[in-house]
């Protein structure tokens, strides 16, 4: 039992959850809250993912003191995300245009032309690489639309530049989420070591 307690405590102290919207954060907080010994803050925060980089300071409430505690976002061994299905025309996501331009410039330097019609999640998949440790794994739920488009070809080339692609899983039989109009793809990506 002590080993389980140590593993559970380690998971609790090293699991960070973030979203741009408050409802998913409320659900995450409720899911993490029922613990016997709550002696460290829940690492749940609201922020646009394009504004999160290693070293970004985030404030949490320490449950044992009630005081605000700042913690720096680390690099992660694992990132899991159900990415937003927002099209390429979005303007409401802060820093999106800047990050998109940076990634397009990086692609050009590698001889890859990222298509202007790539959706937000494509850039998010590429952006997450900077939050992973070398050899870290990203497990990302996306739309499958990029698999069948010209824009998807250059996106795949950029993924292959940054990551070892461990797998792309698609269910061609049914939608994973009943209210969505698109089929899903699950990407499992391992950040390449320099």
Show the residue positions of the predicted features.
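Alpha-helical hydrophobic/aromatic positions enriched in membrane-embedded helices and signal peptides
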Residues: 11-13, 40, 69, 74
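Short, conserved SAM-binding/catalytic segment
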Residues: 29-40
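Conserved SAM-binding loop of SAM-dependent methyltransferases across substrates and taxa
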Residues: 1-10
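Conserved SAM-binding strand-loop segment of SAM-dependent methyltransferases
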Residues: 38-49
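Conserved SAM-binding motif I beta-strand of class I
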Residues: 14-19
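Short, solvent-exposed loop/turn segments at the edges of secondary structure
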Residues: 10, 39, 180-184
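Signature of N6-adenine DNA methyltransferases within the class I
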Residues: 20-26, 33, 49-55, 65-194
